[in-house]
Amino acid sequence: MNRKVLKVIDGETVFPPPIWMMRQAGRYLPEYRETRKKAGSFLDLCYSPDLAVEVTLQPIRRFGFDAAILFSDILVVPHALGRDLRFEEGKGPLMTPIDADEIFWLETEGVAKRLEPVYETVRLVREQLPDETTLLGFCGAPWTVATYMIAGHGTPDQAPARLFAYRFPEAFEKLLNDLADVSAEYLIEQLGAGADAVQIFDSWSGVLDEDCFERFCIRPVARIVQKVRAVYPQARIIGFPKGAGMLYAGYREKTGVDMLGLDWSVPLSFAALLQEEGAVQGNLDPLRVVAGGNALDEGVDAILERMGQGPLVFNLGHGITPQAPIENVQRMIDRVRGGKS
């Protein structure tokens, strides 16, 4: 087995570095758009193993990425908890906001078992993937998932969730712990179904002050890691606290994750320091892929120059956008694999 991404997570330097993209199965691909039409709703796509397998494999067939990431959504966890969830064109995910009293009635026992179609997708993808391709599972971090549950939709600064946490600290702590426990079970099931490693997406960690970051981001993720490792002691786990800034320092040590996913705002000088303590992943601005040309080439070259001589998985600093031209994605891959540093 020669899965380069796993070698990097374990701390090895592989050059040229392995590459995959967050949201690599997505709307920038015509084949994805066709499959999405067949599915009907977005949730039907997530919960239909045959279709979810197809979209997971599409970017592997087209680009030969070094990792495939399970096609699903971070909000299937609250959906399994019994919260309503729908996706509307142009509006993203919509939920009925949860209130403090409802949180105390949430039951976590057996919730992860309701996501069996996701695990079937993992099993089927692993059967069909090339042996050298790493299969990544994932979940949303409790803070990020909670922001959607409380506001009922995405917001620019997550003010509803922040205010809720200040006003109802006991309910909010229970919500984070419940989400951590269900998410841990969810990741354990994914690993059991054949995922090689898992990533925890904390897309909204950058809106918190230092104290709240510690309580709402660090502790719940550490709880997930601890519970996963109680079942799979060697589990490889990637943490992605997007927007954490200076608080990236110490995140790996405090949470127990193996590899740090970096957003594009992290200076490469700081990224290189973080790399001294272990593997990093990132961190090209997704809009450089949209722009192409020199903007793309210079961004790729800078990352390879500063971090190519250490354990690096090349990725974007967040998900690829639907506007990204396919030829620019190929240009990025060719440049990374060309190995300039």
From Swiss-Prot:
Disulfide bonds: none annotated. The record marks 73 as: Transition state stabilizer. InterPro entries: UROD/MetE-like_sf, Uroporphyrinogen_deCO2ase_HemE, Uroporphyrinogen_deCOase. The keyword Cytoplasm applies. Its EC number is 4.1.1.37. One of its GO terms (biological process) is protoporphyrinogen IX biosynthetic process from glutamate. NCBIfam families: hemE. This is Uroporphyrinogen decarboxylase. It comes from Brucella suis biovar 1 (strain 1330). The gene is hemE.
